[in-house]
Amino acid sequence: MLLNNMNGKLIYKILKYIRSSKIITFVVWRIKIEKYLHDTFWDLTTLVLKKELNQNKEKNKYLDMGCGQFAILGQYFKKINSYSDVTSIDVYKEFIENSIKNSIQNKNDINILQSNLFSNINEKFDLISFNPPYVPASTKNEKLEFPNIRYSDLEGIQTAKDFLSEAKKFLTPDGIILLGMNTFYVPQNVCVKLIKDNGYKLEKITKMKFNTSIVLKLKVI
């Protein structure tokens, strides 16, 4: 048990270093980082979303929901499809301000604005991605300056549920949703049920080796 705890702590420290390294972030995302607001630049779910963005780079109008402090996915998509119209949004004003500065620094021409889910959105998109907070609030053991980047309700699905209940209205007829979740916190069967209960067709589930995160590709039924 002691060995397992030590291994777990070591893995956590390694992952934290990787996700807070400016050099690794540039190698993985081709984005330079200067100012940051918290020390986790991206997570394991973001990596799987990147894989799916590469598979759907022909989409022209992309909404990066919950873009965080750098709008990493929005900026990355603009790099792989320079003709795309990209909008990145987040609920935190501080993240929006920092993302705007970072996108200018990296010379990525994308739209970045503050919005609580779709509250400030009035157009439709070919592609919407979301990496919602999915850590159950029942496991909350730390005080964060920006808690909405990590914690949801007691089961970890309320934010995703709220998103899915609105997202249909903001998709073009052939539009798709890429929903990122982490099965370490929310089991895959719970994710699938959530999708079906909200009237979506599950096209596929994308995974990566040694990664508990998944991306569910959805279409409106």
Task: Write out the residue ranges for each language-model feature.
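Short, conserved glycine- and acidic-residue-centered signature motifs
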Residues: 41-46, 92, 156-160
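Conserved SAM/SAH cofactor-binding pocket of Class I
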Residues: 47-122, 127-130, 135-138
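Short, basic/low-complexity N-terminal boundary segments at the transition from targeting/disordered tails
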Residues: 1-14
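Conserved beta-strand termini and adjacent loop/short-helix elements that scaffold enzyme active sites
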Residues: 36, 113-115, 205-208
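Mobile active-site "lid"/loop adjacent to the S-adenosyl-L-methionine
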Residues: 132-159
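Short amphipathic alpha-helical segments
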Residues: 100-101, 140-144, 190-192
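Conserved Class I SAM-dependent methyltransferase catalytic core
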Residues: 159-215
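SAM-dependent Rossmann-like transferase core, predominantly class I methyltransferases
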Residues: 12-79, 211-217
